[in-house]
């Protein structure tokens, strides 16, 4: 049986992830896809969006399997400050790429694309996701919620590939446009990540 604080941790993680993967899928389809023009990368982005939909379903399955209050869990991004803060942090970075007037081609806009990709892949899909994964997987290592932990293992496998892909795209943009990676911009990215 879970201790009350473990149950709270599971609920908060499911509340965050059920919303976060929807944000990720929307960002991929509505924003990132139109700015990444390499055909192979675009194919991968579509695959990633498909996997995010599967993850969202897996979180819903976990919530239902555990008999948790679905409305409460799925509304945590609105009602629980710890979950809402993460979603609110990510929104400006995802919305700017989805802005129909945004176009790359200038130094400033190319840096904006690079900044938003770093925020999206390194911070949101990297740091924020991995914190939740480690918490749930730690329960599985103690033979608690082994089925949920197994679902998170599968999702972690996918998310590791997503993050690595994103970092590859970021590095390729930096290599193709070395003038974007100024000392000032580097410091901005360090501040973003920390």
Language-model segment annotations:
Residues 1-194:
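Non-heme di-metal
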């Amino acid at each position: 049986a879970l201790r009350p604080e473990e149950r709270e941790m599971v609920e908060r993680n499911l509340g965050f992830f059920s919303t976060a993967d929807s944000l990720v899928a929307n960002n991929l389809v509505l924003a990132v896809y139109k700015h990444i023009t390499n055909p192979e990368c675009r194919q991968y982005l579509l695959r990633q969006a498909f996997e995010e939909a599967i993850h969202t379903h897996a979180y819903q399955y976990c919530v239902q399997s555990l008999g948790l209050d679905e409305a409460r869990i799925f509304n945590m991004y609105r009602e629980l400050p710890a979950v809402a803060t993460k979603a609110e942090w990510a929104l400006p970075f995802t919305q700017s790429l989805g802005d129909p007037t945004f176009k790359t081609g200038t130094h400033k806009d190319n840096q904006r694309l690079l900044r938003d990709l770093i925020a999206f892949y390194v911070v949101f899909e990297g740091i924020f996701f991995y914190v939740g994964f480690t918490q749930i997987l730690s329960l599985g290592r103690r033979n608690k919620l082994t089925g949920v932990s197994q679902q998170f293992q599968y999702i972690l496998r996918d998310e590791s590939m997503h993050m690595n892909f994103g970092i590859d795209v970021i590095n390729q943009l930096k290599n193709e446009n070395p003038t974007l990676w100024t000392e000032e911009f580097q410091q901005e990215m360090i501040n973003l990540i920390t």
